Amino acid sequence: MKRLSLSHLTVLDVGPPHLITLAAEAGFRAVGIRLCSPMPGGVAYPLRAGSPALRDTRRLMNAHDVVVSDIEVVRIAADTRIDDYADAFEAGAELGARRVCINIDDSERARVIDRLGALCDLAAPFGLALDVEFMVWRPVARLEDAVSVVKEVHKPNVFVLIDALHLMRSGGTVASVEALDPALIGSVQLCDAPLASPPPSGIVDEARGNRLLPGEGELPLRELLDALPKDVPISAEVPLARETDCMMRASLVRQATERLLRERA
């Protein structure tokens, strides 16, 4: 089985370097790290290349055989300055990350294409690929929106990120994933949820804190996995507000997600 990655949103109350130890003790061998916030004032754990905190993180990674799969979240907004992310990309490369999660909060299409292209160019020397995530409350709301942006940018290191919850809440289907060119899919985030969407006022809260463990809900996760490329990087993004103990939360998430993946295999 490929290394299943622990998405940082699952345990956002824990930052590096302790995040590495927690992930290892919960049975994960890969993690994502939130170096940048997806919103002003949001939670993030910035690391600078060469800093003591980053060296400590690398030391624990080596000690526990845990890799950093990705960094997040680069936010494209009307006031985004591309160079502001250079330090995060350098730190990500030093951590060995290969992918960057991109959120788009700008409805001006031409500006989004220009800035995403510039971010691709900034990321390329660091060996980083950018994965555009779609969410129903953002301008890039649907799978089709993300695909359209990625195709227009037309860079070799930009892809689509498919989050199981966001796919279903935006009206997407497994069939829409099956119809995609698999080369466009950069990574996948798994969780579960009821099939019925909450009211509009509850969509964001569900995504950020009230997801379900794989197998607890009704999302067509097995069918989704069957529609994906076999080698696509997979992370477990399951923030569980009901479970306050971060170690228990991470352990439950790993067990449930690996059970699902074993069934697929």
Regions found by a protein language model. Give the residues of each.
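Histidine-acidic metal/acid-base catalytic patches
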Residues: 1-5, 13-30, 58, 62, ...
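Short amphipathic alpha-helical segments at helix-loop
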Residues: 4, 11, 42, 100-104, ...
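Short, flexible active-site loop motifs that bind/organize anionic cofactors or intermediates
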Residues: 6-9, 44-47, 102, 136, ...
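Active-site beta-loop-alpha junctions enriched in small/polar residues
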Residues: 7-11, 34-38, 73-76, 104-107, ...
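Short, conserved beta-strand segments within well-ordered enzyme catalytic domains
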Residues: 32, 67-72
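Glycine-rich, proline-tolerant flexible connector loops at the mouths of alpha/beta enzymes
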Residues: 32-56
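Alpha-helix N-cap and loop-to-helix initiation/capping positions
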Residues: 45-53, 80-87, 107-114, 138-141, ...
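Active-site acidic/histidine proton-transfer and metal-coordination neighborhood
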Residues: 60-67, 75-159, 169
